[in-house]
């Protein structure tokens, strides 16, 4: 057996350099975050041991730890919700798939997503990692290497027999089984998720195809993505008010929500309204979206950024009940009422305060009046607006 010195000489390295590489390789083999670091060398370098393009944050460490528990068999069903552009696919697909295959070269894995083009992109990126010096360092065994004749973007096979298949959600229904299935963003965009027909099709595909492709009842499933609709797959799995909800199925899952702005009981221990990745998207960026005048942007923020979808139609008000009117159409004889909504709790700072002024005509139609006020303001400004409305509308009684 060659000595460490002989191997170092053969590779053109010093003994210290070789030992450093072996240490990094061993660490990357055991730790997903270490593997992500090692397999993301700086531009122009094939391998960077002490430098990397990958800079993991707290939420990446949490996700990596959960995925490691999937690999160890501690978690059989894992669901993670993250805002857009916060590194979910980079870690959970492009890094996790080669890492898991390297550790399990005889097992098979399926990655499914909303479309074949994205699936192929994932496959190409994973292939690049498989062929990188970092992967060779972490998983040097012959069984862990790609077969030369099986390097298509949609199907990568290792010499040890394991296969990674990448497919759009429509292509999941037929073919070989898998020891792990990873579903990444099953809806392409909000337009898809707003379609009841598409939601039903994705749900049927999830139930019929994902479960049927697993090689055993012990085979894990990872569902990761950005929320798009309150009735998406996650909504049907975990919302007790959803008609499809099954408590027996829901309790099998380990579920983690990572909203852009922290809420009470944050899994990372963040303060309320602390940003998930402040170096990339600040709290001010998300607060501006939360308080935007556009209904669409506010709904996108709540649904995608906060991983907490809201219905375009609420439980109390339906779109068809609402209509606009011209000033000349406003009746002269109305019963005037004013209601207020105050952002007074600590976790509501930066929210707008609202003074809603309505008039009710003799037919009980409610008219929202133009002096309705909705702004971010201090309490003294709010009281001034109350006094203004009371005076302008000659309101006889007011309660605060």
Label each PLM-derived region with a short phrase.
Residues 112-173:
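Conserved nucleotide-state-sensing and coupling region of NTP-binding domains
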């Amino acid at each position: 057996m060659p000595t460490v010195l002989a191997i170092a000489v053969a590779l053109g390295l010093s003994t210290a350099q070789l030992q450093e590489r072996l240490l990094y390789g061993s660490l990357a083999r055991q730790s997903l975050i270490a593997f992500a670091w090692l397999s993301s060398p700086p531009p122009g370098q094939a391998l960077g041991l002490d430098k990397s393009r990958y800079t993991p944050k707290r939420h990446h460490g949490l996700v990596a730890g959960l995925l490691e528990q999937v690999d160890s068999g501690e978690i059989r069903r894992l669901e993670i919700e993250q805002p857009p552009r916060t590194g979910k696919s980079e870690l959970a697909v492009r890094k996790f798939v080669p890492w898991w295959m390297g550790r399990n070269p005889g097992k098979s894995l399926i990655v499914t997503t909303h479309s074949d083009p994205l699936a192929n992109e994932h496959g190409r990126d994973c292939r690049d990692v498989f062929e990188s010096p970092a992967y060779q360092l972490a998983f040097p065994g012959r069984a862990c290497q790609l077969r030369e004749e099986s390097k298509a973007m949609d199907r990568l096979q290792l010499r040890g027999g394991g296969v990674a298949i990448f497919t759009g959600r429509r292509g999941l229904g037929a073919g070989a089984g898998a020891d792990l299935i990873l579903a990444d963003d099953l809806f392409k965009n909000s337009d898809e998720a707003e379609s009841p027909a598409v939601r039903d099709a994705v749900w049927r595909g999830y139930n019929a195809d994902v479960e049927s492709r697993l090689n055993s009842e012990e085979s894990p499933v990872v569902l990761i993505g950005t929320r798009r609709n309150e009735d998406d797959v996650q909504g049907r799995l975990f919302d007790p008010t959803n008609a499809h909800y099954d408590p027996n199925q829901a309790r099998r899952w380990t579920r983690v929500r990572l909203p852009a702005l922290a809420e009470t009981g944050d899994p990372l221990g963040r303060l309320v309204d602390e940003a998930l990745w402040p170096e990339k998207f600040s709290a001010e960026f998300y607060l501006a979206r939360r308080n935007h005048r556009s209904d669409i942007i506010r709904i996108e923020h709540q649904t995608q950024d906060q991983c907490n979808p809201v219905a375009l139609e609420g439980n109390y008000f339906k779109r068809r009940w609402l209509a606009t009117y011209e000033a000349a159409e406003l009746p002269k004889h109305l019963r005037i009422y004013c209601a207020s909504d105050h952002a007074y709790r600590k976790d509501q700072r930066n929210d707008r305060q609202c003074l809603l002024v309505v008039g009710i005509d003799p037919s009980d139609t409610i008219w929202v009046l133009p002096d309705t006020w909705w702004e971010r303001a201090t309490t003294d400004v709010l009281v001034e607006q109350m006094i203004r409305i009371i005076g302008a509308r000659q309101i006889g009684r007011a309660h605060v």
